Amino acid sequence: MEDGYSLKNTVGKGEGVFATRSFEACETVIVGVIEKVLDGNYSHASQIGKNKYVLHAGLISKVNHSCDPNCGIRLNETGAHNFVAIRDISDNEEITFDYAMRNYGVDHFPKKCICGSKKCRERITGWKDLPEKRKIEYKGFVAPYLLELDTEYSSALK
């Protein structure tokens, strides 16, 4: 068991990361540590720049996607992703985040989203395909380079 979370089986998703204590909104839930630099965007890869991808150490790769997540991302001093509570999280609640919060494009999840949320988009997307309303809702809980890429790509279209 890590500090405040552990890996458990979860119905229909295999494994997931669950809180072993409660967390308050804006509290850091998981501290990110970069384990390995990757040469591309693969399943469990975290984008840390325009064409930069890494694998995080620990259980971050086991945190499941949700279209209505309870965690978001904030970069730490090493450039890794800390998972931060968007809202209060209860003890024994599954820790989730939206994969669009860390990757501009996500092309390696071809199947239908199975998050079960009332806000489900029915497919896992990257930031570039996220509805504008959702981007606004996630303000302060996404990797800043995603906003920079939005600006860069929208300027290129003009």
Task: Report each predicted region and the residues it spans.
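Conserved catalytic SET/PR domain of SAM-dependent protein methyltransferases, capturing the structural core
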Residues: 1-158
